[in-house]
Amino acid sequence: MTQQDIKLIAFDLDGTLLDSVPDLAVAADQAVQALGYPAVSEEQVRDYVGNGADVLIGRALSQSMTISSDLSEDLRAKGRELFDDFYAQSGHQLSHLYPTVKETLEELHQAGFTMALVTNKPSKFVPEILEQHGIAKYFVDVLGGDAFPEKKPNPVALNWLMEKHQVKASEMLMVGDSKNDILAAKNAGCASFGLTYGYNHGEPISASNPDFVADSLSELLEVVAVSA
């Protein structure tokens, strides 16, 4: 099955193109411990990511996917501030691209597709990370989690892209690893390509019913009918 009319492809970042949890986990652990809360592990943080940094810190402080109502707004705000500082200081040295990512982006670029990045990650961290991993040149638009009032699964970023590039929903594809990515696509009326690796709170991506499910980003080339 292919989507031969696709013109615009929107990609998630964390868990889709980049395994960033090792750096996120270190920063989250440093932040919660600085506030006198118990340490969090990389394994825990793999479940906590996907809904933006504020939610990540709330979950880390709560040691749970459900954020404790006992946490004050001031405490969560301080935790977020500390997290941002520690994450910025990390230099993102532990993060790495998943296999086939750079090669796939290059082939899509050569084939003439318009590509955008739509992530719930805070915008200020994204350009440096894309440059560091040599993939910034592939994206005409980079939309962080604070680019609009609402994050994925709200479709506002995808709707904005369609309007900017004058494409119909049938001409756009959302590529991601989490329920939020697939729901954002459904809410925007466009097709979705779900990756089985990445971060989806322990739930198989197939449970969100994406239009396509793949174990590797390279399978996207076949979906959009790029000849190898």
Curated annotation (Swiss-Prot):
This protein's superkingdom?
A: Bacteria
Q: Which Gene3D superfamilies match?
A: HAD superfamily/HAD-like (3.40.50.1000), Putative phosphatase, domain 2 (1.10.150.240)
Main enzyme class? hydrolase
Q: Which residues form the active site?
A: 12
Report the record's Gene Ontology biological process terms: carbohydrate metabolic process; DNA repair; glycolate biosynthetic process
Q: Which GO terms describe its cellular component?
A: cytosol
One Pfam family for this entry, by name?
Answer: HAD_2
Where Mg(2+) binds, per the record, is at: 12, 14, 177
Q: Which pathway does the database say it acts in?
A: Organic acid metabolism; glycolate biosynthesis; glycolate from 2-phosphoglycolate: step 1/1
Q: Could you say which cofactors this protein requires?
A: Mg(2+)
Keywords attached to this Swiss-Prot or TrEMBL record, sorted alphabetically, are: Carbohydrate metabolism, Hydrolase, Magnesium, Metal-binding
Which GO terms fall under molecular function for this chain's record?
A: metal ion binding; phosphoglycolate phosphatase activity
Q: Which reaction does it catalyse?
A: 2-phosphoglycolate + H2O = glycolate + phosphate
The protein's Enzyme Commission number: 3.1.3.18
Name the family: Belongs to the HAD-like hydrolase superfamily. CbbY/CbbZ/Gph/YieH family.
**Function noted in UniProt:** Specifically catalyzes the dephosphorylation of 2-phosphoglycolate. Is involved in the dissimilation of the intracellular 2-phosphoglycolate formed during the DNA repair of 3'-phosphoglycolate ends, a major class of DNA lesions induced by oxidative stress.
What this protein is called in its record is Phosphoglycolate phosphatase
Gene label: gph
